[in-house]
Design a protein with these regions (language model features):
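N-terminal glycine-/serine-/threonine-rich beta1-alpha1-beta2 phosphate-ribose binding loop
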Residues: 1-96
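A conserved regulatory-domain signal marking ACT and ACT-like small-molecule sensing domains
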Residues: 309, 314, 318-436
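Short, ordered loop/turn segments at secondary-structure junctions
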Residues: 45-47, 105-107, 113, 131-133, ...
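A short hydrophobic/small-residue beta-strand
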Residues: 99-101, 381
């Protein structure tokens, strides 16, 4: 059979890694796919810059539309990232009858419903394993490996930058701002780190995982996101003292009322495997009704880990190119006519336990006032730490773990506590999950 001709959009870190993997493992990949896969064309904004890959024999252009409109290209690999241009290129490729492989989580999370609808009309595939958790084949695991299960919940460390920052804060007692600056210097975080530290990047990925797990439309706008910027060294230290680790988790849970979709810092018991995933590594815990909890761990970013997922998608495309579109694995795991309209629950309906840290005057009656407010909202205390204030200080930090309560009750209780004259500043809140 004749080779499958591929056009790559973007020759940055992932694009270069993809070319290297395809070249180095060409024979093995062809044996798996049943046909040779050849990159014939590639686009890059700057054609003169040095690269991590060999582009000899590849037709290069600075105009990506030359590739998506080229009549001889069978598959387009989109690795430029971003929203508008990527969407335009992918939809053009689809309109021209080309299959698409992408690592673009923002594209899928925000525009995936439209992209998949157009792909179905044209009978082409759009695969996106590399969009979530880099080299971890988590999408294939949920979409195919766990197809016999009703997925009950999933929770994941799906942003390596945030995990690196929290790990450094814990292991070296460093402040958030200090570690963030280092992460930027090392290339783990962008110059504008908002997407990483405010939970937006993880929210994109959670949107995709939840859609595949529960058979719902992609709905990024309904994901609750809270970043790690307010986490302090004190929080990390007290969490450790209480037997927990702070991890920035993306959590999706199906309940009788609907589906929870949330990204936020979370206390996890130290004994959990996912609590011990450190540095820039990723991990996703998926619980199915038949299989129980399953954990997937690996590199969430990097040239070749992400390229591993891109190339795996290419192999899947080549294997299925000649099959009837009706017999292919659905884009979002469930058949298009079986996507369910299940409500996404508002954040204030979440029920969980909490870690609270507040600063109060060191005098009698203050703690009683705080516990009275919590009790008035039906909130019970599970554990409490109150240390002597430093010499010369009149305020003391109070740390509490609560039992499970509704988010809306906790919101009201925190507002009442912050209104006390004896309490200064904001009450720090971190949600707690046992993940059992």
């Amino acid at each position: 059979m004749k080779p499958v001709r591929v056009g790559v959009l973007g020759l940055g870190t992932v694009g270069g890694g993809t070319l290297n993997v395809l070249k180095r493992n060409a024979e093995e990949i062809a044996r798996r796919a049943g046909r040779e896969i050849i990159v014939t064309h590639a686009s890059a904004r700057n054609l003169s810059r040095s690269r991590i890959c060999d582009t000899q024999g590849i037709s290069l252009t600075s105009d990506p539309f030359e590739i998506v409109n080229h009549p001889d290209i069978d598959v387009v690999v989109e690795l430029i990232g971003g929203y508008d241009l990527a969407k335009q290129l992918v939809l053009t490729a689809i309109a021209n009858g080309k299959h698409v492989v992408t690592a673009n989580k923002a594209l899928i999370a925000l525009h995936g419903n439209e992209v998949f609808a157009e792909a179905s009309k044209k009978g082409v595939m759009v695969l996106f394993e590399a969009a979530v958790a880099g080299g971890i084949p988590i999408i294939k695991a949920i979409r195919e490996g766990l197809a016999g299960n009703r997925i009950e919940w999933l929770a994941g460390i799906i942003n390596g930058t945030g995990n690196y920052i929290l790990t450094e804060m814990r292991d070296k007692g460093r402040d958030f701002a200090d570690v963030l600056a280092e992460a930027q210097a090392l290339g783990y975080a962008e110059a504008d780190p908002t997407f990483d530290v405010e939970g937006i990047d993880a929210g994109h990925k959670l949107t995709i995982l939840a859609s595949i797990a529960f058979g719902i439309p992609l709905q990024f706008d309904k994901v609750f996101t809270e970043g790690i910027t307010q986490i302090t060294r004190l929080d990390v230290e007290y969490a450790e003292a209480l037997g927990y680790r702070i991890k920035n988790l993306g959590i999706a849970r199906k309940t009788e009322q609907g589906i929870e979709l949330r990204v936020h810092p979370t206390l996890i018991p130290k004994r959990r495997l996912i609590a011990n995933v450190d540095g820039v590594m990723n991990a996703v815990l998926v619980c199915g009704d038949a299989v129980g909890p399953t954990l997937y761990y690996g590199a969430g970013a990097g040239a070749e880990p992400t390229a591993s997922a891109v190339v795996a998608d290419l192999v899947d495309v080549v294997r299925a190119m000649t099959s009837d579109p009706e017999n292919r694995v659905p884009h979002l795991a469930f058949q298009a006519n079986a996507i369910a309209d299940i409500p996404i629950l508002p954040a204030d309906s979440i029920k969980t336990a909490y870690y609270l840290r507040l600063t109060a005057e060191d005098k009698p009656g203050v703690l009683a006032d705080v516990t009275r407010i919590l009790a008035s909202h039906g909130i019970s205390i599970e554990a409490l730490i109150q240390k002597e204030p430093p010499k010369g200080e009149t305020s003391v930090p109070i740390i509490m773990l609560t039992q499970q309560t509704l988010e809306k009750e906790m919101n009201a209780a925190i507002a009442d506590i912050e209104a006390l004259a004896t309490v200064s500043g904001k009450v720090a809140r971190i949600r707690l999950e046992t993940l059992g």
